[in-house]
Amino acid sequence: GGIRIMNIELCKAEIKRHEGEVLKIYEDSLGYKTLGIGHLCQPEDPEYSWEVGTKVSQEVVDMYYEQDFEKHYQETIHVFGSEEDFENLPEPIQRVLVNMCFNLGGTRLSKFKNMLKACKEHNWDEMARQMEDSRWFGQVGRRSIELQKIVLECCST
């Protein structure tokens, strides 16, 4: 075991690739105002009142991404239970959980009870199976298959 430090830069690059990056205000699939790397505009954001299509600077996009990433990283640890247990996971598994949390939010991630249980038991085969046994898996397409592949690669080591 021992503490494994998550590769933050790699994790952020993977999420950015999966979320995409848009330098303007756009509507997500549910019609919510979004900007940058999947940042859901909040009423307290200055951009909340902006028209869809308004350009947003790279600096602003990066700032929200920093905040959102940190928030979801902390949420992932909270959902998982303890920082120590989270840090004892193989590094790629840590990235998968943070990526899922960024995509789903902590509340929805916490509903993946069987997947989290398998993860806590370091049962990667079962974790991969449980990922697939969800509506999310079909909804996000290539992203879920890629994340599942990372989990399955942990089996083979």
Predicted segments — roles?
Residues I25-G31, S110-K113:
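Short coil/turn segments at secondary-structure boundaries
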Residues C11, S29-G31, I93:
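Residues that flank catalytic or metal-binding motifs in active/ligand-binding sites
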Residues L23-Y26, V79-P90, Q130:
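Surface-exposed patches in mature extracellular/periplasmic domains of secreted proteins
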Residues G2-E21, H39-C41, V56, V60-E66, ...:
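Long, amphipathic alpha-helical surface segments
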Residues W50-S82, E91-V98, N103-L109:
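Alpha-helical segment that forms one wall of the substrate-binding/catalytic cleft
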Residues G31, S82, R143:
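Glycine-rich, flexible loop/turn motifs
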Residues T34-G36, V96-N99, E126:
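Structural recognition of the beta-strand scaffold that forms the well-ordered cores
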Residues E27-S49, Y65:
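Substrate-binding/active-site groove segments that recognize
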